[in-house]
Amino acid sequence: LMRSSAASDVYKRQIYYLVLCALVACTTASCKDSNDDYIPPALEPEKPEVPVEPEDPRADVPIHVDGEPYTTYKGLLMTGYQGWFGTPGDGCSHANHKNTEWYHYRENDMFKPGVLRNSIDLWPDMSEYEIKYDTEFKYPDGTAQVYSAYDKSTVMLHFKWMQEYGIDGAFMQRFVGEVIDNPDGKDHFDKVLASAMDGSDQYQRAIAVMYDLGGYNPARFEKVVADAQAIYDTYASKRKYYLHENGKPLIALWGVGFNPAERGYSNEDIQKLSDKLKEVGYSIMLGVSTYWRAGGGDTYTPGRASLHALIKSVDVIMPWYVGRFNDINSYNTGGSDGGFANMVGKDIEWCKNVNESGESKVQYAPHCYPGASDLNMHPYYERGSRERGKFFWTQLHNCIRRGCTMLYIAMFDEIDEGTAIYKVLRKSDVPSNAADVEYYVVYNPKNEKISYSDMNGIGRSTENTVFMAKNKVTAPTDGWCKSEKELGITFEGIDDDLETDYYLWLTGQAGKMLRKQIALQETQPKR
């Protein structure tokens, strides 16, 4: 009886277990999703964030096709070409006069070692010139030589360099005070211009004429128009590579917006000249004062309304900056608008606004320069540092990143004010500038009347700002009297570890950056 009871208990437990399993199975079945075949997707791995490329602020500009005419300044990097250096024996009528034979090399009618006895601060690298002229300057191993722009081979070499280094062309400087009523000056600049036109043809460089209005006055209106008409008939309307803008040959007038009492002409005078040159068939570019937009500084503020009216009537403007800043800090902080760098942006914006409003079609060509130095002419100035090209590149990068469509570089060959980009000697290679006589230099900033003995020992008096004296004189108010040796002014060379063509190369790189052929870069490129 007891065994039967135990078996019964086992049987009950088995039944209970089976019922429990059945209940669990039913519950699971009732809760199961009807989509028995569903397989959840695999988790995708996280993708790294792709950095967003900053928008390129550069303007879209046309790319000139080799061998085609230059129909617009847009997309071009142009340089100013002085072409004003001459020498004894070069064939120019300047060489017939002792006081002008060393044309633009001279200071105080001579070209000799010593401050105020020559006008240049850089010395050209003469290794590639076909015709060379001996000077009184000496290297440790021989006589230093220079060139004359009156020689065609010299100008052709310069245009060859423009092609080799990617400089699009040149504005040929034509100085009113040197070509109007001045047969010797006209002889020189006519010959240089003719050579440059041939250089433009051979090396396919853009070319245009820029009148420097120094020496202009209303009485010379007809003579300047006649000169411009002759250039139009001979070159501008016929040469394949003469630069055009808005369908017409471009001619530039430099020196607009300054004080008329100092310049000898007003904005209204230049408006009249500009309008007449349009009738000849030209489009017009103006070289204007730095502060043309807002007034002040070098700009004649009472004439700002007439200046703006003149600007709106032309095709291109180019403000002048040489001497307004001499290092990167003053470029970024000086001037108005919180720095010259910002002024460029504001200038571009002003031109854009008047174009969009329909008031004008004027384009803006910012001006950049590699540095400046003219101590042999002005020993009371400071010599700016090129900072191995950083000073130059800072300006170029700023103008391009702010959306400029064209550039003007000052200057190709200006060794007298130290702005030249062509091949010049390094610091350790320049000739000596030590004078062979003793004399004093007097700085007279208030233009007081000073008595002194000239270099020949003759007693004289002068109110000049700076002059040479045989003997020491009492220093003028706020000025000084120093010996030539004490001043110790040497020629300025480029850095010894740079090639003599470095600034030609750097300028060419800026042209590529303007056209988006290389990246926009704040740091100057390495060669």
Which sequence ranges carry the predicted segments?
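Single conserved hydrophobic/aromatic residue that forms the stacking wall/gate
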Residues: L1-Q14
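Bacterial N-terminal signal peptides
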Residues: Y17-C26
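Bacterial Sec-dependent N-terminal signal peptides
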Residues: C26-D60
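Glycan-processing catalytic domains of CAZymes
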Residues: P51-R527
